[in-house]
Amino acid sequence: TRPELVAAGELEIRLEADAGARTLSVWDNGIGMTREEVVQNIGTIARSGTREFLQAIREQKGQMAPELIGQFGVGFYSSFMVADRITLVTRKAGETTATRWESSGDGYELMETERDVAGTTVTLHLKPKDEEDGLRDYTEPHVLRDIVKRYSDFVGYPICLKADTLNSMKAIWARPKEEVSEQEYRDFYKHLTHDWNDPLDHVLVRV
């Protein structure tokens, strides 16, 4: 074992929204990344497909199609659908310095910085709310609660907004059927299939 890689405290994910600054930050105290890992895993603006994806977003005025994400296979850069700029600060467990990565979609800047504990923070500098373009206000607590419940309820670590834990951390297939609502079944189906319609029916099978 490597004790320097053990997280400070229990592993968790925090959402921090600032309506005045128009930012949404996702913070964790996981293992973090080195500078080299940031370049390899995040600094992919110039890679094949990514520039085309960002260009497609700009051309999708009024139609923020989620299918673009699957088409180009660049999940992290789908953040540019809701943000003009992304800032990432990460510190690898066992290291004393952190790395700051920032991009507006046309390349990126990389520099050394500080972070109190190991882990990663991704900050989205949000575009203005635009209902016609499918952009909700991602600084609103009820919007964040809805998104986490719909898409991340069974993530195995707590996702917190201030003092509240937003997810159950238990997959619906591992819960007693009487504890799972019809809406949860419908939401889970849509999450898996990306189908906007409700399922015709559901069948519970235990093996």
Task: Give short role names for the model-derived ranges.
Residues 1-138, 146:
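GHKL (Bergerat-fold) ATPase N-terminal catalytic module, capturing the glycine-rich phosphate-binding loop
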Residues 68, 86-107, 127-207:
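GHKL/Bergerat-fold ATPase module in large chromosome/replication-associated machines
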